[in-house]
Amino acid sequence: MPEPALTPERRHVEPGGLPPPAPAPFVELGLVTCFSFLRGASDAVDLATTARALGYDALGVADANTMAGVVRLHSEALALGLRPVIGCRIETVEGLGFLAYPQDRAAYGRLCRLISAGRMARLDGEWQDKGACDISLAMLAEHVEGVHLVLLPPDDLDAVLTIAVESNVVPFVARGDAETRRRKEGVRAEGAEETEIAEMACSRRSRVPSSTSGEDEMPAALAACLRSPDPLRSLREPENPHISATLTAPFADLLPHLAAQLPTLKHLAASYLYTGDDLARIARLDELARGQGMAILATNLPLYHAPQRRPLHDVMTAIRHKTTVARAGHLLQPNAERHLKGPEEMARLFAPWPHALQAARDLADRCRFSLEELRYEYPEETCPDGLEPQDYLEQLTWAGAARRYPGGVPDSVADTLRRELDLIGKLHLPRYFLTIKDIVDFARAQDPPILCQGRGSAANSAVCYCLEITAVDPAKHALLFDRFISEDRNEPPDIDVDFEHERREEVIQYIYARYGRHRAGLCATVIHYRPRMAIREVGKAMGLSEDVTAALAKTVWGGHGRSIKEAHVEREAGMDLSDPHLRRVLALTEQMIGMPRHLSQHVGGFILTQGLLTETVPIGNGAMPDRSFIEWDKDDIDALGILKVDVLALGMLTCIRKCLDLLQAHHGQDLTLATVPREDPVVYDMLCKGDSLGVFQVESRAQMNMLPRLRPRCFYDLVIEVAIVRPGPIQGDMVHPYLKRRRGEERVEIPAPGPQHGPPDELTSILARTLGVPIFQEQAMKIALDAAKFTGLEANRLRKSIATFRSRGMVAELE
């Protein structure tokens, strides 16, 4: 029976808690993760944990035409003391595959740019489809500097391959064919070479795949060339660089051409196929490699971390090819040998070719690039010439403070602004704030203005308030700046800005136009298999009927979780759990849950860079017109410390905008979000009756039920109302004590520390406004900072552990 997936929640290894292992004699470089969607059957946790147990000290990653999985493997490998070797597998439109490993930061940038080119445009220059990637050998040759290539040979070394090549290789191949014939015939005819070249060029007609028309059976440019008076001269002239031809030849005959066109191609991948002739096949590969000045490189090309994952891989293969496991036939792997094998096992298999093992070790040692080398800078366009970003930010902040506080900036606010600006400068964040300011200013400068509002932890920042990114005065509401940014923790701030949902596209296209598509991209969102999707697709691949898979899907309660409850299957679907096939389907489904299905675009998280974003991470096209997004999601971005700009859509802002327009049109009242009266008694009378249908934040059944019980009479009461109807306060038994104290049914008692531990009002200053009941995350952080003397980093960890229901044991660590 397949074993359950090893998830991050089940890994009991402290990051950095293990010493680095001794160098192994071999490094696996052909590994794919589950981010080679429906091709890799193990995630980064499984792979890194298994690699550590097998004795590896380094581990390569080579997902197909993508860098989507490198950050996760990077993080998990480092946590286990392993060195991640960052790379990918390039699959060309000609049908050839290469392992590609950059040796430094510049080479990594070229590799990302290559993948971006394949994902953003077709070979004809048209807009690329989402998820597709067209990379030609010519494109690869333009980006190989510093990128070590390992050619993946076909299983059958005698197979005849057809590839599209630039016209200038036709004479090269013709000369090769001519020399072969001459060696056989022992003759050398003067002038024969040019004749043979012309014959080779003209013979292309029969080698091009058939089509419906006659002359168009060959590429149009080549056909025009052959109709010219001197086709040989046309083929050789440099003014025809884009003429291409189709070349058909055995793999061995293509190898010289590939070696000549790809100067960093120095290795052929050698692996066991377990078809009975592996020794002879690898020996022949070794001979071919030596003939071109190359070497073979050992790899098992693992598709999963352990043999037990082979059934899941079969299911993934069936899903990918839209068939069933029973009908997949030769599409499936013939055995379970494509798992991650240890260095000792690989040394046994490649005992006749120790240089193949050494080649893998040497290549891994040469490729020292790490994702930690990525240095991220925000665009410079937001800063006028002659001004430093920090100086310009301070100038805008103090000008905004004068507008926010027309009667004079209070001393406490001025002190807060100085402290925040100093920290922003120390953390090198001025451009980030200037970029947000630029986007918000664009929205408000439109005619009519696009309604927008900053929210989230950015409301804790006085700088954001003075820049008019947010509309909440943190001094008035005693908000904690450490919730937003802290010097103690190494993570970027997060500023979320909501825009009218009907006009957000204007903002997005402005960002693309201002910074360019190669410097701006939306974050990705990883679409994972949830229980219902998993049971439907696994069941279909395993041959279950649609009725059965639908019945099984209905037994899943909720959209999350990592298991299918057998009791629900038996009781609600009426199925016999003693059926071994059904139990196997359920076990495979549990393995599939949580696996990535594909990438989608984030709702609005933008990454902007000063240099080419395509040299930091590959960019691909979205399903929506004129949308492109990077291959990393918000967790990947956070892990690397890269900042993002959240350009979000909020339907209620559109509703409010139309409301304000109607007030202006019919009643002559010119109101904005900032000038709408906050303390209107008639409005609070309606809210106390629960009359809030369609009112943002208080329209749910739970909120409508709470309103008559809490009876808000001011704006801050509404803040408490929205916050208290949350899982945390409800499960923490904070709702009833607060309501009783609000109604006078319970005394308000706030504990005070002893004289030796702090001032008597230490907690009163934090909890007085909520009647001694902690409701907000900021209150928990403030208590930890003042009473428990936590550092900012520890207080933020406490906040995250309280807010995240999956963080079992994190609170106990901080006790």
Question: Predicted regions: what is each one?
Answer:
Residues 1-165, 172, 250-815:
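Alpha-helical scaffold/interaction cores of sigma-54-like transcription cofactors
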Residues 166-168, 175-213, 220-238, 242-249:
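Short, low-complexity, charge-dense intrinsically disordered segments
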